[in-house]
Amino acid sequence: MDTCVETFFNPYLRRKPRRDWRRCEDNNKNFLQVVPRGVLYDGATGLIKVQSGMEPRMFYAEKEYVLNPDKPWPTLRTRGWCRGPYSDDVRFHTYDQVVNLVLADSDEQISPRWNSHVVPAGNVIRMFGATDEGVSVCVNVFGQKAYFYCERMQSEDLKNTVYDIADKVPEPCSPFSVSISPVTKSSFYGYGLGHIPNLYRLSFNNWNMCRKIGKRMLEEGRKVYELGVDPLARFLIDRKIPSFGWCLARRYSVRAAGYVSRAQLEIDCDVADILPIEEQSNWPFYRCLSFDIECMSGTGAFPAAENVDDIIIQISCVCFGVGEMVHHAYDVHADLSTPAVPENHLFTIGPCAPIPDVKIYTFPSEYEMLRGFFIFLSWYSPEFITGYNINGFDIKYILTRAEKLYKMDVGQFTKLRRGGRMFVFSPEKGKAGFGTSNTVKVFWSGTVVLDMYPVCTAKASSPNYKLDTMAEIYLKKKKDDLSYKEIPVQFSAGDEGRAPGGKYCLQDAVLVRELFEMLAFHFEAAAIARLARIPLRKVIFDGQQIRIYTCLLEECSGRDMILPNMPSLGHGAAAAIEEAAAGGEGDETSEGENSNNSRTVGYQGATVLEPECGFHHVPVCVFDFASLYPSIIMSNNLCYSTLLVEGSPEVPEKDVLRVEIGDQCHRFVRENVHRSLLAELLVRWLTQRKLVREAMKQCTNEMQRMIMDKQQLALKVTCNAFYGFTGVAAGMLPCLPIAASITKIGRDMLLATAGHIEDRCNRPDFLRTVLGLPPEAIDPEALRVKIIYGDTDSVFAAFYGIDKEALLKAVGALAANVTNALFKEPVRLEFEKMFVSLMMICKKRYIGKVHGSQNLSMKGVDLVRRTACGFVKAVVSDVLHMVFNDETVSEGTMKLSRMTFDDLKKNGIPCEFGPVVSRLCRARDDLHLKKVPVPELTLSSVLSQELSCYKQKNLPHLAVIRRLAARKEELPAVGDRVEYVLTLPDGCKKNVPNYEIAEDPRHVVEAKLSINAEKYYEQVVKAVTNTLMPVFPRDMPKREKFFSLVVPQRIYIPDQFLHLCGNVNELARGGDDSDGGDSEKENMDTERSSSHEAMET
């Protein structure tokens, strides 16, 4: 088989006829009307369900409209069709691409010019985008093959093998043609292995069958290369086409009929007639839509889309634009010469009172509202859709209601009139696809879905990620509060009642639109897509593996190299690599875990120096390596292609880098023998990033500056992802030798850095002559420099006996000295920051005050649990403020951290530490003397499931729900946070479980119940203890009991015993005169609270 042979395979000649996979049109005359009873009868509850034979309709501006998908939406400007003729090349910007399989018997009206590409079937790439003028475009690209490589066995007819395998692959099957040709390529894995013998390329015009046949060949033990690369990736890489950028279409034909898209201009062309325009980075105008839904549960529980009675009652939309030339493209009466102003739309069941600046569409039922919403989407045709948690809730909820309950064909409302798809995919835990992530994915043909919830969770550090919290952090705004329980009540209260619910629904969409523009993640994702040549949706949903893989694929394609299909690593290697990729220590595991996994592969993690736990009230300088892992790859020539493996030619030892890890040794050839391909990529990208950052300084256009900023960020993120790419066991191209070698080299670099700093900086002459410190800044008696922690890419050096201001001026010179003395380009040690006080808790956990800042810097520290009450958080915050900002308390804390337990028993705590103890005493007094408001003592937990589903019944928030039910009060729904307060009933025991004394805060206030002060004080002490644990004497047994030994005890006398206090005082005085007694009584009255008396012992 020495020539390229194309043959056809039709599975239906040997099997039953194929099923018709086309969806039925949604044109049922009868439909189910589900209407809240409150729409017809104000204040009524429940639903009305009837079968309707009328045409679906809506009302807008007191006019009735039939919901026909072919009729323009009344408030949107109709965009004209651009059907040509076009005489020039079409220049367009593409933002999304999808691959469709078109069969020869398809009813798609394809010109004879391109028809040969779909016989018997063909991959058709649909490129969505816009022209310079903002005209929406769909380019149908014909002729792109899907292909992979495999080694032919001796005397094998590869064509017959492919057909035999095609007969065995699982349904559904479809016709395909295959061409098989010999190729000369070498493997990317392993140095000097030469060309792969008997290597053939198998090219298919049917991607689905290509994937199934290749997978079966791999399962049979054949050597297969680059399996899983879809035709879109081949098109973008082989033709150098940007997945997000400008292109040129030549020799095309404009569709005159049989449109498959809703674009204004639809053209067909050959795969060879699309050219890239690389030099331009601006955006055309793209339409965006932010939306939110409001639901009403039929049972009062958290809504479930599968329940017929849990209906959607309102949908809010905000239409806006991104890119250049942003006009009122969605407004009928817009002046196109002015910038666009976001348009607000509200879809609601039943009439609604007017809301300023909002277009309100009213519908008789849920079905009609959903139908109207989809028709609106099809006419507005947004390129971007956003919202908050829409991947996990809103889109899934709408699709479930539309498809399962009302049997709607939602695909027809996408940008594709035929073959459009709209679905949500939730992979099972641990079962994500090849090179993908475990996140919920949304596919919407021709539209990019960008949920702001995962964006915020990735970018913000917050106790919670509610939209209200994110709006406060980024926008300095607060949501208008409307309880979930109030929405159904308001909705059923008539026209005027539905308006507040509509405003509440709309404000979420408005806030998300502002977050979308503020965080500008679409620019960042677009820059990554352009760099890696992957669709924008893969940047959003598929993690970092696919980005690096396609970059390597492109680099290898120009060097006659191919990527192997690597098997996943074993569990032991997986555990070690993933631990190291996260910056952990591979030779140490958490309590209760199997610690043998990492050792079985001789893998050692990146943490190299145990932390010196305690409080350091001296300058602590942090040094880290700039781009540590990329610089290790570049400086040591690490790569798949430089790794010496079995079959590699002999190389002189002087030209080999040996990385010894335990009893294993990984060997790589040096740069003079063969240049690392990974290093070449990194050098190119880092150079490009430097140029972009330089260009940013000269750029005056804000939009262009933002695009360049996201471009340099994309380059940085992609460079840093290389180490993780090699080290993820279930990744697309895992390589333990590279990942382990990077970690080992990094470990050695940190050890060398620590040794150099400690050796040189403890010499006064080095400090003066090399670092330029003045003699008066150095105290020779107290001089001591010590590395107190080393982690992944950072070292923490404590400097005793050196003036911190003078030291701050010299640390840059110290970093440069270490770099020049120990490392070669491009490795560079940099000074990051100086802590003036640092509390080292343990590995990866510390709190410190940075020089020049009033805020505390924390890592791996959650000071108090998220469920803690406000009072506990306030006390912990006060204690930390004293420890880090009060010089006296800081000195006392450092003294305490140096004491032994015997010192503590003999001398007590340092007097400078006394204010911390006093703050705890004051907290205890405030609790016992009822000075703390109930809201500050309120705890909360989420009701994550139905009450009956909990295996552990004795939880405080569950007990509160049972008490609410017993009093016949309103109950929380699943998903709500249940608030509670710990009370002190009569006869309450000291160690009573929390669930027995938990009560609803409103009931506590109304019934004037007593607070369980001791329980709250225990929480305060526990939180402060957990925070300050490193400063307690290390040899002290049961350090968690520290404050019970140093805080003075007090007895708080209940109200009913206060009248006895006077008699006790008289007996103690031994019958003094009445004047003294009156004075004592007067003092007692002054200190007495309304309920307790505190007596210190």
UniProtKB/Swiss-Prot annotation:
- Look up the EC number in the record and give it: 2.7.7.7
One term under GO cellular component: host cell nucleus
Per its record, the protein catalyses: DNA(n) + a 2'-deoxyribonucleoside 5'-triphosphate = DNA(n+1) + diphosphate
Which residue positions does the secretion signal occupy? none
Annotated keywords: DNA replication, DNA-binding, DNA-directed DNA polymerase, Host nucleus, Nucleotidyltransferase, Transferase, Viral DNA replication
Q: Which PROSITE patterns match?
A: DNA_POLYMERASE_B (PS00116)
Q: Where in the cell is it found?
A: Host nucleus
What domain of life does the native source organism fall in?
Viruses
Gene Ontology terms, MF aspect: DNA binding; DNA-directed DNA polymerase activity; nucleotide binding
Q: Return the annotated region ranges for Disordered.
A: 1069-1097
State the PANTHER family in the record.
DNA POLYMERASE CATALYTIC SUBUNIT, DNA POLYMERASE DELTA CATALYTIC SUBUNIT
Family according to the record: Belongs to the DNA polymerase type-B family.
Record-given protein name: DNA polymerase catalytic subunit
- Tell me what gene encodes this: UL54
